């Protein structure tokens, strides 16, 4: 109920005329303030008028006014700037830590909002607000999608900066971990990230001219060269890895971290590792090269690559496949661009103050086709137009950060749903 009161107050869904405090003072709401999701009062810098006197300060909201004392606000100086206390049930007076009384407003949550909120909270449908999607103004949808896209950019930027710190501010290292994670797609993302953290890129750089040695590094650190027996190529890689592991004091990851069940041969970790080995063998300073590419076609051409000859007819060291190149599909390339290249362009642009890179990142999303997954299909079935990857990224953000967390009160579509009668 308290969350709903926050919503009602923030959006002024209550009669604004002839408001009075619980002691009969005339009350006018000029500005409801800025919502605070952290510790402290619920709304900052509100502006109200009581009996003609303007007050600027904070707002605190409770279901019962006695909650003020239960939460210890009467002893906390942080709440001394509260100028209005709001409660559905006013069962006591409240005061600041210095004993001063605080004006109170008795505020009910309208019945239709309570009923609409229960509908959203109790439905198993996704999206829960599907009924109103076709009736929403295009401007409402467009502005919310734009905000969600930027929110996703900022969230990914924060994650990348954390990864950059982990890599001691080596952008190439952070990029390699991110790229590897996305080469694992949904099934092996965590395993690929762990694997990438086992790869000593400075050591790999010293042997980068040899694809065979890069493969020895990559497959050895993946834990895939532990069997004593295998074909000639496997045994050569194993011997090379033993030499490199001794030279650079390497230890491989646990091979059981890899998942193989229900994977197509071209999606097996071995194939993805071989593709990454080929990419790093032929693309020194990969991140720098990608930063210079101005078109999606150029990026695709750089990433597409292939593998060494051995992998043209293998998907593991034991498993053979029909002879043919093992290149990334168009849809896989698009996902890697969306989830790796675009976020890095944006993060690097922010970090270096290069607006051009940020604009290029957002522009790439508008050029790429939207992702095709359950989330996007469900929204499309509701009548929402998903035109490009920027839209699909916005909807993924909406699902993960609002729908899954039941944060309908903070969603603009949720706002439209709740206020309907």
Please report, for each region that a protein language model flagged, where it lies by residue.
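Hydrophobic, aromatic-lined core segments that form the binding pocket/scaffold
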Residues: 148-394, 407
